[in-house]
Amino acid sequence: MSTARSTTHLVLAAEAQDLLFREARTANTFTDEPVSDEQIREIYDLVKYAPTSMNQQPLRIVLVRGAEARAALVEHMLDNNKPKTEKAPLTAILAADLNFHDHLPKVFPHAPDAKDYFADDDYRAESARFNALIQVGYFILGIRAAGLAAGPMNGFDAAGVDKEFFPEGTHSALVVVNIGKPGPDAWYPRSPRLEYDEVVTTV
């Protein structure tokens, strides 16, 4: 049931609002039900429309399925994140491609010189991470839209993950996300949210 004070101006169905926002939680435990490549493909085909500056789309996703790869990832997680990452049916490493500009001639074709805007390495890396994080938020919503739960974490050794999974040095790990159906005691009690008047000002 919707808990919104008012949804008069929202066109999305109340059930969808609840699925994506009000009733969605960060899961810490999962069932054994597998998450298929087809599910992830459908999620991506939905969330690929997230807005990014100059359509740069720097997010890259590594699906960790193999036992050896999972064990390697777990080694780089903080202790409280190790058990949930070991047991989740699927874990994804979300990273920023620091060479996203190589794709700009394809994805931003009306500006043939767009790639040149990002010649500076530091500026390009900052833009890659910023825009990839926008895509991360959309990816989490896409997981929820598929009826799954997401457990995003930034409690890990990012340098270690980069060395393990991106040894070429052109990607920067941002978030690790466990994905699946929520298991027993999957979440803590809902923490308070700031209210509208605490966040929004008009000038």
Predicted regions and their residues:
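Residue-level signal for well-ordered alpha-helical positions
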Residues: H76, K106-V107, E164
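Small-aliphatic-rich amphipathic alpha-helix that forms the alpha element of a beta-alpha
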Residues: V47-K48, A92, P112-E164
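Short, flexible, mixed-charge acidic loops at enzyme active sites
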Residues: L104-D113
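N-terminal amphipathic, basic helical "cap/leader" segment at the start of enzyme domains
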Residues: S2-H101, V200-V203
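Short, well-ordered secondary-structure micro-motifs
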Residues: A72-V74, H103-P105, A186-R190
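Short secondary-structure junction motifs
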Residues: Q56-L59, A145, L174
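C-terminal domain-closing interface element
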Residues: P182-V203
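A glycine-rich helix N-cap at a beta->alpha junction
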Residues: K82-T85, T91-A96, P167-Y188
